[in-house]
């Protein structure tokens, strides 16, 4: 802890401070920089001697580095610097009295005439503004003003009192007829332009010839209704569930059905422009031959069977027995047919040609 911080302050502290401030020398920097901070009376314009405005070079620049000054005790002279004026520029006041211009007597009369012809705005202007204007500009302005006055006078004479009278009904009808004709012509022109515009519109080119269109879409899947279940009461089985037991199951089924989105399936459609193209790509085969309905020769009914030996159709067992008995009598009288004897013991016959079968090799026996 220092002694100055612990002792009591002196009663005479600061008495000599005001004297020191008054005795303090004014700094040369504040007196010379930017022209100084003191205002001088009557310093309207900057005036200075030629010696004040010239820049002075320090004496140190004239002496070489190797040379030493001859005397160290000589006092250096105060350096004088150029004073800079910082006050705002003021324009000199204009004299209120107009300057007199000597003009001949003949020109004064002409000027009076021009003054009467010029507008009031040009007459009220001061003499300085009139003299500053170029002579050619003033002449053009005067001529323009004269032309405007002349036109205004002519228009007043032409107009005179004018009263518009109301049109009669006949005149209104004439104007309406003329307007109607103009509107009709305008409408015809508009319609003609619209027709020309439609003709110029590029029409879509149609593809000549047959067209096959392929179109694939997604459609919701519709399920087939399942078989309806019937409740069957059987004695001895579990009792019917109560309403409390069915409630949660019913709610669960409804929620599951609502949460499950419907299924979708794709469908593809192929469209042909004409039937000829369809038949070309999907040719139809020859219609199958309708088999001839054979009749039993014994009962004259539609034959349901065929005898493998005689190849004769028959309808009933009684007809079959009659056919076999007739076949035995034929063999006894005429013997076996040549095809039957050839099919006896021996090597197997060659394979039949296409279109020929065992029925073609058999010889039908006509029963009388």
UniProtKB/Swiss-Prot annotation:
Organism of origin: Mus musculus
Biased composition (Basic and acidic residues): 127-142
A cellular component term, taken from the record's GO annotations: protein-containing complex
Biased composition (Acidic residues): 40-75
Localization (cell): Nucleus
Top-level taxon: Eukaryota
Record PTM text: Phosphorylation is enhanced by ZNHIT1 and promotes the interaction of VPS72 with histone H2AZ1.
Subunit record text: Component of the NuA4 histone acetyltransferase complex which contains the catalytic subunit KAT5/TIP60 and the subunits EP400, TRRAP/PAF400, BRD8/SMAP, EPC1, DMAP1/DNMAP1, RUVBL1/TIP49, RUVBL2, ING3, actin, ACTL6A/BAF53A, MORF4L1/MRG15, MORF4L2/MRGX, MRGBP, YEATS4/GAS41 and VPS72/YL1. Component of a NuA4-related complex which contains EP400, TRRAP/PAF400, SRCAP, BRD8/SMAP, EPC1, DMAP1/DNMAP1, RUVBL1/TIP49, RUVBL2, actin, ACTL6A/BAF53A, VPS72 and YEATS4/GAS41. Also part of a multiprotein complex which contains SRCAP and which binds to H2AZ1/H2AZ.
Phosphoserine: modified positions: 127, 129
Keyword flag Zinc-finger: no
DNA-binding region residue numbers: 156-206
Tissue: In all tissues examined, most abundantly in brain and thymus.
Protein name: Vacuolar protein sorting-associated protein 72 homolog
Principal location class: nucleus
Bias type Pro residues, positions: 345-355
One annotated GO molecular function: histone binding
């Amino acid at each position: 802890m220092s002694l100055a911080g612990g002792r009591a302050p002196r009663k005479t502290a600061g008495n000599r401070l005001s004297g020191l401030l008054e005795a303090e020398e004014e700094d040369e920097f504040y007196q010379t920089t930017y022209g100084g901070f003191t205002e001088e009376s009557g310093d309207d314009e900057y005036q200075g001697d030629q010696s004040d405005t010239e820049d002075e070079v320090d004496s140190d620049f004239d002496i070489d580095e190797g040379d030493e000054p001859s005397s160290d005790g000589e006092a250096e002279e105060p350096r004088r610097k150029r004073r800079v004026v910082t006050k705002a520029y003021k324009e000199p006041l204009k004299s209120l009295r107009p300057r007199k211009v000597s003009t001949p007597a003949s020109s004064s009369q002409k000027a009076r005439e021009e003054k009467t012809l010029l507008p009031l705005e040009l007459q009220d202007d001061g003499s300085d503004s009139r003299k500053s204007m170029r002579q050619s500009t003033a002449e053009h302005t005067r001529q323009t003003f004269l032309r405007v006055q002349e036109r205004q006078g002519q228009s007043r004479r032409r107009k005179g009192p004018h009263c518009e009278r109301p049109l009669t009904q006949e005149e209104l009808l004439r104007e309406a007829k003329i307007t109607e004709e103009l509107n009709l012509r305008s409408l015809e022109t508009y319609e003609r332009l619209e027709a020309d515009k439609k003709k110029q519109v590029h029409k879509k080119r149609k593809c000549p010839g047959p067209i096959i269109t392929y179109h694939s879409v997604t459609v919701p899947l519709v399920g087939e209704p399942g078989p309806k279940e019937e409740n069957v009461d059987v004695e001895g089985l579990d009792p019917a569930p109560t309403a409390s037991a069915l409630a949660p199951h019913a709610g669960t089924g409804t929620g599951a059905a609502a949460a499950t989105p419907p299924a979708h399936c794709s469908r593809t459609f192929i469209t042909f422009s004409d039937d000829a193209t369809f038949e070309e790509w999907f040719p139809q085969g020859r219609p199958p031959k309708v088999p001839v309905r054979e009749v039993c020769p014994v009962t004259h009914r539609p034959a349901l069977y065929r005898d493998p030996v005689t190849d004769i159709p028959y309808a009933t067992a009684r007809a079959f027995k009659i056919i076999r008995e007739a076949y035995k009598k034929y063999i006894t009288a005429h013997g076996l047919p040549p095809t039957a004897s050839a099919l006896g013991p021996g090597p197997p016959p060659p394979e039949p040609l296409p279109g020929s079968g065992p029925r073609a090799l058999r010889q039908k026996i006509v029963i009388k």
